[in-house]
């Protein structure tokens, strides 16, 4: 069992998003917000705090950044948000042919499951365009279908958002929300064909085991998908391993979708359900304003 799977990876509760309609730079916003927060904590103003130059920070702020380090990741990771956890490496760390776990960006929409029993995990394939409903254990996936290992690039659809003009809402990614790891699993096509796909199939959608940030178990965090033609392509995988090891919890242990060539938001983590649709999937965050 993956040693990462029982870790609670949420580090603190400080959001580092700047308002999209702000006229100040993100760095200036963060610096001023941090100074204001520290002033409130100590009960007095920080002398000349509003004049702190770019690149300079108060000692207390430096200690706060230390507390936001992510276990298993390089200390240079830039944490954009902590609930949900989103972080990226500085781009100069991404010069290796295969991106290692410790330098891979983290993009969450909800709270990852804290404990995972991989032996009991089930993936259910169903939907109005499925000929039947079938559930697979991970052991059954490994036994029934041919294994494939592919090196696939994943990139957040918001990568580079901090440079948008006019500014856009959301995590202010620089350009580190991209990775190129090796993924091992079975082709999504093989599993779908085993279940049976009706002629009217248009899309597939995924569901995962993460929890909504509100804590409401009835709310679906995110459920995106891809056209059925994309689902049937060779590089669309149901993966259980990354770089030759169990997928780390932060990246979707024990199962995730990997759909090469499409935004990483279509690569559902903690995968436990796939629906075959007779229309464009309409799950949460499938609309044009959600990415």
PLM features per residue range, with description:
Residues 1-28, 51-56:
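N-terminal secretory signal peptides
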Residues 19-23, 44-99:
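C-terminal segment of N-terminal export signals and the immediately downstream linker at the start
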Residues 25-46, 188, 257:
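N-terminal export leaders
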Residues 149-177:
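Short, conserved helix/loop micro-motifs enriched in His/Cys and acidic residues
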Residues 177-184:
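Mid-length scaffold segments of soluble, non-membrane domains
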Residues 193-230:
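Gly/Pro-rich turn-and-neighbor structural signature
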Residues 221-247:
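Acidic, His- and aromatic-enriched active-site or binding-groove loops in soluble protein domains
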Residues 254-291:
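Catalytic cores of secreted or luminal carbohydrate-active enzymes
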């Amino acid at each position: 069992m993956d040693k990462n799977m029982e870790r609670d990876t949420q580090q603190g509760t400080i959001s580092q998003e700047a308002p999209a309609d702000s006229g100040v730079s993100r760095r200036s916003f963060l610096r001023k917000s941090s100074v204001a927060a520290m002033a409130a904590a100590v009960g007095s103003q920080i002398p000349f705090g509003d004049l702190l130059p770019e690149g300079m920070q108060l000692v207390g702020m430096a200690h706060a950044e230390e507390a936001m380090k992510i276990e298993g990741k390089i200390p240079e990771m830039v944490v954009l948000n902590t609930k949900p956890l989103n972080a990226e490496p500085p781009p100069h760390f991404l010069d290796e042919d295969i991106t290692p776990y410790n330098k891979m960006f983290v993009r969450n929409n909800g709270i990852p499951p804290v404990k995972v029993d991989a032996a009991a995990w089930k993936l259910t394939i169903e939907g109005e365009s499925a000929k039947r409903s079938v559930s697979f254990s991970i052991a059954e996936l490994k036994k029934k279908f041919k294994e494939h290992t592919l090196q696939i690039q994943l990139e957040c659809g918001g990568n580079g958002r901090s440079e948008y003009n006019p500014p856009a809402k959301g995590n202010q990614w620089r350009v580190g929300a991209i990775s190129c790891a090796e993924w091992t699993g079975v082709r999504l096509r093989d599993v779908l064909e085993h279940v049976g796909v009706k002629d009217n199939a248009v899309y597939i959608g995924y569901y995962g085991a993460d929890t909504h940030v509100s804590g409401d178990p009835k709310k679906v965090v995110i459920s995106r998908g891809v056209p059925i033609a994309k689902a049937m392509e060779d590089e669309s995988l149901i993966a259980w391993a990354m770089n030759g090891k169990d997928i780390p919890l932060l990246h979707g242990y024990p199962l995730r979708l990997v759909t090469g060539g499409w935004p990483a938001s279509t690569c559902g983590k903690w995968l436990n359900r796939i629906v075959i649709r007779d229309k464009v999937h309409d799950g949460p965050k499938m609309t044009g304003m959600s990415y």
